[in-house]
Amino acid sequence: NIKALEFAAANPFIPVVTTKITGIARFDLLEKISLGVDLAPEEEAEYSSVLKRIDAICSAAYKTKTSIFIDAEESWIQDAIDSIANLMMSRYNKEYISVYNTFQMYRHDRLEFLMKSYEEANNQGYILGAKLVRGAYIDKERKRAEERGYPSPINKDKASTDDCFNTALRFCIDNYEKIALILGEGFVKIRQNNKIEFASFKTIETPEIDNQFELIYPISD
């Protein structure tokens, strides 16, 4: 990741690098942290090492004025990922927006979590970096929930997800002075399906906060 950041820093057409926490930390460790289970001493040391590696990446992003997108992953490890993302934002999102967390809006709890993340960022004096997407693990999430007998974290239908996505988008735009917004693949769907709704959002004109739109290559058609 650090080499990727160095490459991006030398190329004005690459403003951001994406990272998956599961590429740095063991899945089982993240799951245990998300469950709130006490870690064994060797696991504490392992997690400390993970945080140091992630901090080194985010520090490099800050120094090179490049941004890091922290991907969202499965719901049963997401609490640990969110905790890491918030920690890194609190360190590196004060003078420059270096770190973005990803919010999968197909989860019915993500709108509330987005608002809580905004409140936490305000209280701690940093800018929330928010990348909004719909989500990528829908079948896996529903299957696991059914097999293990707990309520699915996924919205009941696409319309509900669209509502959550659009409400989250409006919230971020309404608070653009304190939220650095990235829209993933959802921008295309909003542009195609909700032209009037999207056009009704306020115009963003601020040099301080960088609001961007991106398109994931596989769905570019």
Where in the sequence are the language-model features?
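Positively charged, amphipathic and often flexible ligand-engagement surfaces
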Residues: 1-221
